[in-house]
Each structure stands twice: as C-alpha cells, then as structure tokens.
Amino acid sequence: MPVFPFCRPMTCAGLAAALVAFSVGVQAQPAPADASAQIRYTRYGVPHIVAKDERGLGYGVGYAYAQDNLCLLANEVLTVSGERSRYFGAKGQTLEQRDNLASDLFFTWLNSPAAVDAFLQAQPASVQALLAGYASGYNRALVERRRQGLPAECGDGEWVRPISSQDLVKLTRRLLAEGGVGQFVEALAGAQPPTLARAQSSAGFASALARQERFAAERGSNAVAVGAQRSANGRGLLLANPHFPWMGGMRFYQMQLTIPGQLDVMGAALPGLPVVNIGFNQHLAWTHTVDTSKHFTLYRLQLDPKDPTRYVLDGKSLPMARQTIRVAVKGTDGSLSQIERQVYSSQFGPVVQWPGRLDWDAQAAYSVRDANLENSRVLQQWYQINRADSLAALKGSVEQLQGIPWVNTLAVDQGGRALYLNQSVVPYVDQQLLDTCSNPQAQGRLVVLDGSRSACQWKVDAQAAQPGIFPARLLPSLEREDFVQNSNDPAWMANPAQPLTGYSPLVSRNDQPLGMRGRFALQRLQGKARLGVDELQRMVTDEEVYLASLVLPDLLQWCKGASADVQAVCSSLAAWNGKADLDSGMGLVHFQNLFNALAEHPESWRVAFNPADPQHTPRGLAVEQAAVSRLVHQAALASLKQVSESGVAGAARWGQVQQALDGTPVPGGPQALGVYNAIYSVPHGQGKRLVVSGTSYLQLVSFTDKGPEARGLLAFSQSSEKASAHASDQTKAFAAKQLALIPFTEAQIKADPEYREVVISERDKGAVVSQP
C-alpha cells in the first residue's frame, strides 16, 4: 500500500458552523484531528476507501455513500428520528407502508435522547470515531450536492438536513429492533388502557400482521461455506447470498475499507453503518443468514382489577410506568400541531395492544421484552469481524461480545476450515422455563410468558454478554472441513453428518420441516465431488424451482384426467422448464398460485414430514385422493382467474412480468418454491410485478496461495438515485448472470478500466481533488 496521499489545505468556503457541531462526539475530549480520506472508484462505482485512522475512514464512507444515496439516508434519518409527520403529515406512509404517525410515535419512544446517548457512550473510541467521521463526510457531501441541486428523490429538500453521530445510532437501533419490538410498531403506538382506548383501524393491524409474516421472506439469505475436504483447491470457499430489501434502510452498499497496516476489508454494509456487514479480508470470508431464533418474548400481565394501568407481580400491585411521547404533525394547511400519546411499560417492557390477538382489557395486558434493546455491542462486533485475522479470532469475538443481533454467521478461512454459528442475542428461556411459565393459549409462533411471577424472568448467566440472554456455550456452533450451509432453517441441518440438536426451542428446533431452499442446497452439496466457484454460482443462477421436482410430475399426472376448464393451466405446466428464469413461461405463475393454495392443506402431501428423514420429506402430491384432486382443480380455476385479473398475457415470459423499478427484467422467484435465487416481488401495474426484496449483495470468495479471489455484484446497483450512472448497471449484469471480479488488491484496483480517485479532507474546506 503506498503512502497515503493527503490533500493540501485549500482556501475555499468552509462548511457551515452548524455542520461542525453535528460531527462532534458526545464525550468531552480534545478536538479531533482533521479527517482525510482517499476514495478510489472502480467498475460500477464501487468505492475503495483509504484513511490513516477511523475518523478518516468514516469520513470517506459517509461522503461516498452520500454521492450515491443522499436522499435515501436522509429519508431513513427522518424516519428513525420520528419526524415524518412534521414534513409529510400523519396519514402519509413510510416505505414499509406504515402510517407516519404510528412510525413517529414508535421511533420517538425507541430513540429517546437518553437511549441514544447511552448507546453512543458505550462505544469504544474507534467506533465513535467511525460514526463522527461518517456524519462529517455525509454533511460535506450534502453541502456540495445542495449547491449543485439536490437529486429528484429529495423532493423539495426541506426535510434533508445535516446528520450527527446520534442519527447514525438511531439507524443502528432501528436495525437492532427489526427482529423484535420493531415488528410491533402499530401495537406499541396504539396501546391504551381499556377506559381510554380509541377505535383502531383493523386494516392497519392487518398490514402489520402481513409485514410480520413477510419478515423472513424479505430478509432471508443463503450461505455455503466449503472447507478443504470439498473445495476444488483444498482451501476455503464461500457463497454469500443475502436476501434483503431493494429499497430503504436495509439496502446494502458495496465498499472496501482500508487503514494501512490495521484494516483491509471488502464487502457490503447497510445504510448508515461505517463497517462491513458481509465480506472478506486477506484471511477469511464471512456472511450471515437471518436465523430462526427468537429475539423477544411477550409477557402476559395480570392486571389489578381496580386499575388496568397496574399489574400484579408476585402478589403485589405495581403501577405501569408512563412516558409521554410528543410528535409534531403537519396539517393540510401547512401548520404544525402536536400530538401526545402515553406509552405504558411494565418492568418487562412496553405494553403492546393488538386487537383480537393481544388485547388490553380489564384482566390482562401484554408487554414485549426485546433482547436486542440492550445490545450496544453490534457495531463493535462487526468492526472486530472486519479486522479478524483468523477463523478462531472471528469465532472468539462473536462468542465473547455476543453482538450479532438476529443472524447466523458462516465463514471460511484460507486454510480450509468452515464455520457455522447460530450465536445471536437470544432470551435465556430454556425448556424448563417454558414448561413452567409459557402460556398454552399463546397464538401462533409468539412466545408468551407469565408476567405475574418474577420466577418467569429470563434466566441470567454470568458468562453471557448481557443479563437475560443465552451464553455462547449454550448456542449452536459447528466447525468442519467439508461444508456448512444455511438457508434460514434452524441450526439442525447445517451439515447432516453432524446434526445440531438439544437446544432451547427459542434457539433452534429439530421437529419442523426444512425450507425448500435448504433442501435444494443439501441436494446440491451431497456426495464427495469437489466444489469450485462455478458450482456454487450455479446454485444461484440455475434458477431451479426445487419444489417442482417434488410435485410437478404428480400435477402433470393429474392433468391427464383434468376437465377442459383448466387445460390452459395444464398446458402451461407441461411447457414450463421448471425454472424461475427470464425465459420461463406462465407455468411458473400457475405453479406458484397452485402451491400457495395447497400450502394451506398439508394433508395434500403424499409423504408427510418425517423428522427422521428431513432432507426428503414431505414430498409428492397425493392427487389420487379425491379431496386433493378437488383442491388442485379449485386452485387451478382460481389461478386462471387471478392471472386474467392481473393482466398477465398468456404467452408472457417471467422476465416480462418480474422487473426492477427501471424495467430491467429480474430472474429468480419465491423462496417458498425452493428458488435459491429468492426474489420477492409485488403486483405493480397491469401484468407486472415489482421486485422489492431478494438477492442483494452476491459474493463468491475462494482462497489461493496469493489470498482471496472474489466475484460478485450488488443486484440492485450502488445508487438509489434514478439519474445516477450506477442506478441499474449491476442490475442489468445480474439479469445477464454476469458476476464480475471484485477488485481487492492494490494491483486489481488500479488496473480497473474505470479507476478514478478522489481525495477529501476536512482541512480543504470543501474542495475535492479528483485524479484520473
């Protein structure tokens, strides 16, 4: 690495004094040195950022990110600050289709000044410097871009403002809450005692329920870590295929971070984070998949019959805590008013109210306790992973810090070891505590504990990183030299040769069917054949619909005796290639509709799920049974009606139906069908479906004698700004299955045909030095 080239001081107009104030840390300390960064861009606009220290590194990240996604981050900061209603009114909606008012009430509660400052104070100096630098870099870019004219995505720009370290903490806390209390936004914002309860929209809660059910589908992932015994060259090999939203606050950004002699890591990060979440360095490569572990529990409160805002604990009546939340709301005439709500809490957590599911009446109420609200270690955790020089160092860091919020970790090293960790922040509720304290009337997958007894509090272990969570020794861990894999299944079948069992149901279960993607992966990985990058890439790009291999022959057999009114469905199924590729026909659409209907009837399987044979059950469709035959016929008729109403042409190809926002055809399909390249799309106009989530940062890393070699892409491209040259370039490459070399070494970066360099420094007072 060459000596870092700092920019000479420039005599240009300085940043506004207000921006300087925003970049200062919360702790009293000497004024930090001016931040500097060198940003080298390669193909697709990917920044490779070099700095001498963390503040400079954060400065470069914030500046680069704001060149591509200024309005996206500004919008997310507005959301997590609880200020949407101030600018857009109470009835507008967030990207997640939440009413602004409910969102603002929730985030004003979640990100109180005390909670945000406590989180920031808990960070080590290195992380505080990264955050302060990021805010300063973003603010510099904001000044420059406002001078040039803000992107169209910023609208009138009234709501776009400088940011601070505290704003970045708010974004981080929102990410932490995604797997817990963040799924109860409306339920928390609307919770009121029965004597004060207002009429609540059932439609709003129906939307909230739909979002809960979509959580795993929109934030899934595939991962395969191959060790020396199975990799083609006897070294580590990793496939990272996270499935995340294509818009908003969970949209990945590709970048390389370098502090010479200390840090050199390449990968992708979520908005507002100055660290790499999924990536590789000289020694190892890692990725994450959303886990099936529970990260919160509910507590059923026994209320004092004299007062529904008091609850009984161990025979004593205790008052609920009350917190007044105030939100500014813009009226139709442009004037501002203030709305107040009370958030009630027990010692377990905030009270939530979900009509018909979690009712607050005279007898009972429900509190939610989210383990990740006490996780201030998450940024430090990823920064330590970024700097890890061995698989042992990565594993030791995850076990000690326990900062991973709600994902599994899979990794390989250059020596050919493969690692799987289901070690996130999970409430310490074992089977014994469940047997003693759980509510047998609890609905669905929610864990509801008895809130009338202190004995039902989460257990505390001195070796855990925080009170009330499982220590690492009680969480699944597996290290092998053949392979480990995960596609959002429990830890159980990470490698069938060594099943992981015996854990709390809140951690991992082994009594439920594997997902179709997991079964597909295990089928591809079975045997002893050596695996290379091409084999792992084809797992994604083959676009195979695994479920079709299990039931399509039965459907075609049924079609031989089907009535004339469903022959169009049968013809399309017979002509379908069994894939979710751009050229796949309407058979894919009808197959998906049929499966969605039959999924409600598990008795339709010819061979039911058998825990002793999870890789091969359930399978087959019992079409020979009259009841199943009727179900298939009804589903086929419904599919014809649905296709007709959606406006999809009978001869349409999948690439003409499923597209990105700019119209780029997108391959892939529903994860429930076993499509490894999982893509989640929604109806969007006549005969079209818009991709909103799915394959995001796709990374394949192999290790050689010279270090890591990587190929991949960012499926939705670097920039969320329509006018950017990098708004859809990688999306087109994704559609064409053209994964590119990911430049990592100095030679690879400088050899890139689109190489350009930018040098920025706080000393230069706003000037940018660009070198061709």
From Swiss-Prot:
It is found in: Periplasm. Catalyzes the deacylation of acyl-homoserine lactone (AHL or acyl-HSL), releasing homoserine lactone (HSL) and the corresponding fatty acid. Possesses a specificity for the degradation of long-chain acyl-HSLs (side chains of 11 to 14 carbons in length). This is Acyl-homoserine lactone acylase PvdQ. Residues 1-28 form the signal peptide. The active site is at S221. Heterodimer of an alpha subunit and a beta subunit processed from the same precursor. GO terms for cellular component: periplasmic space. GO terms for molecular function: hydrolase activity, acting on carbon-nitrogen (but not peptide) bonds, in linear amides.
